[in-house]
Amino acid sequence: FRATDSYWVIAMTDETAQTATAPRRGRGGGGAARRAERTAVSIETAKYIQRNIPNYEIMTEEALDVIQANAEQILEEIGVAFVDNPAALERWKAAGAEVTGERVRIPKGLARKLCETAPATFTQHARNPERSVEIGGKNLVLAPVYGPPFVRDAEGGRRYATIADFQKFVKLGYMSKWLHHSGGTVCEPTDVPVNKRHLDMLLAHMTLSDKPFMGSVTEPERAQDSIEMCEILFGKDFVRDNTVLVNLININSPMTFDSTMMGALEIYAAHNQACIISPFIVGGAMAPVSVAGTLTQVLAEVLAGVAYSQLIRAGAPVIMGAFVTSIDMNSGAPTFGTPEAAHITYGVGQLARRLGLPYRSAGSFCGSKLPDAQAAYETANSLNMGLLAGVNFMLHACGWLEGGLVASFEKFVMDADQLGTLHHLAKGVDMSEDAQALDAIREVGPGGHYLGCAHTHANFKTAFWRSDLFDYKPFETWDEEGARDTQALASIRVQKLVDTYQQPTLDPEIHAALLAYVDAKKAAMPDSFM
């Protein structure tokens, strides 16, 4: 073939698949129509990933035994701190722990025994039942970035986030096929008072999307508000009997459980709502510089946190989390997508499976200030390690920039597009009779080509994953269209998704009740930006 024939392969259609036996027809605009079909906006959501590939396990059973023994030793000899939380200390005393001041020392085996009542899998229900997700087992649920105070877009650059930005991200998440979850604090709406912004964020998730979402954890009272709003959305009986919220409970590593996070955990666990118990690991700052030492601390912290959730309510759903990064010893900045982070992520996955708990880690992590090559490399490393590590709930799966300080609109759609590769990788290798393609190999024979054979004609539309964002055109076409880079293409896609967004239907009475709840709560307290 001539070099230019490669473009014919990429733009292949039902008709061109038969060119070996049929005369080529004149151009009639079909290519443009097919390109439009490929890039058309859809509000279809792919089902959560069900892996058909093995997990990547780098730790031997003997090594895991050592980590486990060391973690138990830490809990028994050093202990963990439950600060400003007398009720927690009393619960630990009653369970058999040794409590001195705010230090809780947990006898060997006690925390692990308490963890046994936590479920290995659970369902988080969405208001649209077709978008409910099962967390645990071989499944992977993808959720967007969480927590940045800043946003960035190609036109306005970096700025503080607003509630309008938050609502825009929720719409983008709803329109993103490969994203299963609406997330939580996709960005921090700094134009809304701190004590009221959780209400507006929850309202956005509940009304602008029908995917599952996360509750507020910044104060126990806000956790209670989250549950009460869910009771309006789903009904009190449904919330009583089902899990409708997943909530991020960060541990103050090393080995400190603060009263704010534990207060939120206590509310959610008591109501049978799921909590991610997640050490916040920055190697060299909040954990040892060594992988083995970090794994030991992570396991000790998670054992204590999960055990405490079960003291609140045995059987409450929990996810074993690990936010993992290391520190640049020259600048003090966090680093992402590194080999050490991968080792820890793989290792924690093995420890989570030993405990029989769902696992949260990884994401679209990067330290870059722009959605550039550095961001792409670091993000690719982080996403792929999450898939291979057996992660069940991946927070920060799209939109993360600048070490989590920034939520980027362009990177959100770039990452969301790439999440499609995780879905396809997770399928594994098809070994069906059709996939073995012996008939195609016989048909083509030595020296032929597969472009016109029956097997290609039957399968070419679904044989290869294809980005909805990237540019695959020849240089001349790309140049004529403005020589746009990926960020420019992403900016166009952001606008297209926003312009074609269609709000999911919601019972008007429920919508009105949510608005009334939010208005009443806001009216009952003065604004506070502290």
Predicted segments, located by residue:
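Short beta-alpha connecting loops at secondary-structure transitions
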Residues: 52-56, 330-336, 364-371, 399-411
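Glycine-rich phosphate-binding active-site loops on the catalytic face of alpha/beta enzymes
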Residues: 385-405
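N-terminal intrinsically disordered, cationic/polar leader segments
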Residues: 13-64, 72-76, 82-97, 104-140, ...
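Catalytic-core signal marking the mid-to-C-terminal active-site face
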Residues: 14-16, 20-22, 28-47, 58-70, ...
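Flexible, glycine/charged-enriched surface loops at secondary-structure junctions
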Residues: 81-89, 100-103, 180-181, 240-241, ...
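Short, Lys/Arg-enriched N-terminal segments with co-localized hydrophobic residues
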Residues: 1-11
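Helix-rich catalytic cores of soluble enzyme domains
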Residues: 157-388, 392
